[in-house]
Amino acid sequence: TTGCAGSLSARRDMRPIMLAARSLSSRPLGQARHELSTVVDRWTPQQGFIRAWGGWANSTLALAQLQSSIGFTVPSFKARAAILFEEVGVALARADEKSLADLVTPSCLRSMLPALKARPRGQRHSWTSHGVTASIKQIRLAHAKQTGGEEQRRYAQVTCVVDAAMVYEISGAGETASTGSSEAPHQLCDVWVYERALGDGGSWRLKERLGTLSELQQTSQPNGTGSAQG
């Protein structure tokens, strides 16, 4: 989209958004209760034909199963994904651990806590965003054996590209910095993985932020560190 393309050449002070990005990035820390232990089949923007075709087939099958099991629809999920993006951003800026515990998976929350606790006393962060849109890139289903000898539970993971205009500001504790402004918001294009348990009581949460779309495009080039082979 235009917003995603605009983020590739933005040359503003990126410290605030990089601080937020580090807090949002989750690295799986082993099997956690009530979630999958890792991201299933990490999505990359540029894939070979065979892998792309296989991925499409897997997503189509997973979509049909989600529709029958939880009444999943693409429009309603995209709306929820956009809202969750905003809710996580606001809770992260406020260092609201209680809200984050409801919005992200346990492993994702554990990865956020060091950055939140390292903030200087008296420092304030703020996050505002608008025009948030989410596009689905991949859907996967997997099982996880729960701790305590419980039966396996099924989970869904949906990878989305999230496009948003946002402003992230830091003030207090001797520092003032911002990414974007109300007049010229920063165009952010992120790739998020959302996860939920199927069945009763399941809700979508952030599993992991994979990075910006431009970062993933660079690492998935044929000569890059990612794989672009089929």
Where are these regions (language model features)?
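Juxtamembrane and targeting peptides
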Residues: T1-L92, A228-G230
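Structured, amphipathic secondary-structure segments that form assembly/contact surfaces
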Residues: V90, K98-G224
